[in-house]
Amino acid sequence: MQVTFCRLRTHQWCFILFNVILFHALLFGTDFVEEYFLHSLPYIDVKVLEIKNKARKLNIEPLRSNLSKYYVLSQSEICKGKNIFLLSLIFSSPGNGTRRDLIRKTWGNVTSVQGHPILTLFALGMPVSVTTQKEINKESCKNNDIIEGIFLDSSENQTLKIIAMIQWAVAFCPNALFILKVDEETFVNLPSLVDYLLNLKEHLEDIYVGRVLHQVTPNRDPQNRDFVPLSEYPEKYYPDYCSGEAFIMSQDVARMMYVVFKEVPMMVPADVFVGICAKFIGLIPIHSSRFSGKRHIRYNRCCYKFIFTSSEIADPEMPLAWKEINDGKECTLFETSYELISCKLLTYLDSFKRFHMGTIKNNLMYFAD
C-alpha cells in the first residue's frame, strides 16, 4: 500500500513537472521559432556591393545646403562635434504636445546610459492648423528637440516621414552609431536596450533589428486605406520587416537606405517600405521578441525591466513604469521568469479580448447595414 502510494506520488510529480515544461515550451516556443528560424536568406550580389560603395562615398552637402527645401525645423547643429551612441527619433503627431512633454519627463530625458551618449528628438510633419504650427514653433524654441519635415503629417505620408528622418540622421547626425525609430505611443526601456546594443558593438554594420514580421500579405482591397495595387507591389508576400512601432538600424544601413529610397515603391505601409529597402540592400532583419511590436505589455516591474518596448502605453502608466524600472532594485532570475510568464499570458488575453470585441463590432455593423 505504501509502495503504491509512493509510486502514485512520483507519477503525480512527473505529471506536474511534464505539464510545467510543456507550458513553458508553448509559452516561449513561438519566440524561439521567431528568433532562429523566421529569417530570410542573406545575399550579396554586384548591385548590393555597388550600393554599399555609394553609401560610403555619399555626398550630403547638397542636402545640408538646402535645409529649407526639406525641413521647417531642422536642429541641424545639435549633433555637431558629438559622438552619439543612440539617436532616438520619436515619431509624433503635431498636435500631441502633451505626450511629448510626458516623454521628455520620463524615458526621453535620458542623456546617457553606462556612459554612452543618447540623443532624443521628436519627428513631425506639418500640421493642418496655423495655430498648431505656432505652438510647435514655441515648443521647439523651448526644448530644441523637434525636427519638422515639409510635408503634411498624415497617415498617407508616413513613408515620406520615414524618408525625411533617415535623411536627417544621415546628413546631420552621421556620428550616431545606432538610430532608433519609435512611435510616441510606445514606452522604451533605454537601459535594457542600450545593454543589448553594447553586445553588438563588435558588429556595428548591417544592423536592422526589431520585432520581425514574416510572410505578411499586401492589402488588395481597393476600399481599404492600406490598399496596395499589384502594379506597385506584385509579390504575394512582403519581405520580412521590423514592425514600425520601434526598430533600430545602424548608421551604415541608414546611408544605404538613403541611396535606394527612389528605387523602392512608396505605396506600401511605412514599415514595409523600410523592409523592402532592407531587402534591396541585401539586409536580413534581426528579430528580438523583447520588442513588443503592436502589442501593449501589461505592466509589472520585472517584466518592464527586461523588455525593450511596450506599445499603446497610457499617459498615467508611463511615469509609474519609468520610476519603477529605475528604482535600483534588481529582479532575481526567478522574479523575471515568473513575471515574464505573467506578462505574456495577460498580453495574449488582451489580444484575444480585442479580437473578440472586434468580431462582435464587425458583426453588428454587418447587421446594421
Curated annotation (Swiss-Prot):
GO biological process: protein O-linked glycosylation
Name of the top EC class for this enzyme: transferase
Similarity comment: family membership: Belongs to the glycosyltransferase 31 family.
Location in or out of the cell: Golgi apparatus membrane
Residues bearing glycans: 66, 96, 109
Name assigned to this protein: Beta-1,3-galactosyltransferase 9
Source lineage: Eukaryota, Metazoa, Chordata, Craniata, Vertebrata
Transmembrane segments: 13-33
Keywords of this entry: Glycoprotein, Glycosyltransferase, Golgi apparatus, Membrane, Signal-anchor, Transferase, Transmembrane, Transmembrane helix
Enzyme Commission identifier(s): 2.4.1.-
Pfam families in the record: Galactosyl_T (PF01762)
Membrane topology: Single-pass type II membrane protein
